[in-house]
């Protein structure tokens, strides 16, 4: 991506002298002059946690009557698309959840986001074809263990693991038949766990699921048109510029029906439900001319508004209707009413920011989600800017914490200051040949610095911009199966030794996060290799 220059390693000790207007319940948090940056600088009741997803951590794919998911089949059918890795064992969270909850306790976290695997509950996708009692009990045991340790569960109903039987029967989310089946499954989880779980997410990253799986084909089920750059030659079927919109339309309708069921669930009273969105923040490229000042907001409509606009206002953003035309499905008036205000909070998975440039000449004969947005955000433009050239050699993405604050302020202003939870935020790295070196892997200076800067940016959004953020979940508790990267990308606070019994090892970032969540008394000198201290 951008050109990266190594600078001498710098020490960082965070000192916080924070002032500002007082927020009623957050008076101490936003007026503290304590030099130590700790959780006390955040509002009372703010949840700090970590996050995982069932397919990425559980393993045990053939235990407890679990059925196959779309990703099980994808990793076996196209092993080259996932670095020849699969999640049959993953990090064995299915068997080790109790010891992993002890790690959460060591971190001083009070929240944990995890997903329920649809085929572990309904092995064949529908209740009439059988319920796995072992699967149902597993999640009861997990939730009970979390609660016994004072950890609040945040449950994702669907994190990309469509039951393969539904894929085979009617194409999964390509068919509107999925709406009824998903709603049945979601309602089952609400009725089963709703008295214990009060924070729910229907869908994780519907934008990524739709675009990556059905428009560029680099995630399951790997569908795209042959003309898609980089991935087209690897796609065996699909129709870019069409299928992603159908899939997302069905997800939105399934979300609306599931939320309706949730709000009618007696056990679920007092609970909240939403979607975990995954927008980057976008800055206008310096090559953008003045007549095109809207590439940033236009692209945010396509990446965030695609799903947030309907669940707030009942319909797609006007920019999407204008650019996509007849290929964008339409909602009926009844569907619009059901979608409107169908989220109690907005989940945000934030990792990075990107530059956006108006795309003058998309080819109408080769439609795709990106060409429809009329915005080019190719990484090649990054080297023209110093501000975003913050990417150590091992990092998976550019790092820009200011983008988080900008994004949150945008959501506040455009969507009526909703409650927001940071449902994922994390730093991934590929250590290459040094991946098995504990000395290198555990000294994760960059991740520690990343967390610090993003928490500072989050604090500014809450205290200076008055954004209503109520929780932060770091991705991830531990290294795990990272989709097309397999096990090469590491995002965890704990290192998982894949060659030695999946042993967990505490990283420097885990030590810092634990201290931050305790009292911040332990000072760390953090080394970093970012070109500018603008994160």
From Swiss-Prot:
Per the UniProt entry, the Enzyme Commission number(s) are 3.2.1.21
Task: Return one GO MF term.
Answer: beta-glucosidase activity
Q: Where in the cell is it found?
A: Endoplasmic reticulum lumen
Top-level enzyme category: hydrolase
Q: Give the residue interval(s) assigned to the motif Prevents secretion from ER.
A: 532-535
| A single cellular component GO annotation | endoplasmic reticulum lumen
Keyword list (alphabetical) reads: Disulfide bond, Endoplasmic reticulum, Glycoprotein, Glycosidase, Hydrolase, Signal
Report the leader peptide range: 1-24
**Residues engaged in binding a beta-D-glucoside:** 56, 159, 204-205, 351, 424, 475, 482-483, 491
**Catalyzed reactions:** Hydrolysis of terminal, non-reducing beta-D-glucosyl residues with release of beta-D-glucose
Question: Which PROSITE patterns is this protein grouped with?
Answer: ER_TARGET (PS00014), GLYCOSYL_HYDROL_F1_2 (PS00653)
Alphabetically, which GO biological process terms does the record hold?
carbohydrate metabolic process
Glycosylated residues, chain numbering: 187, 468, 501
The keyword Signal belongs to this UniProt entry's keyword annotation: yes
Q: Which InterPro entries match?
A: Glyco_hydro_1, Glyco_hydro_1_N_CS, Glycoside_hydrolase_SF
Q: Which family does it belong to?
A: Belongs to the glycosyl hydrolase 1 family.
* Stated name of the protein: Beta-glucosidase 20
Native organism? Arabidopsis thaliana (Mouse-ear cress)
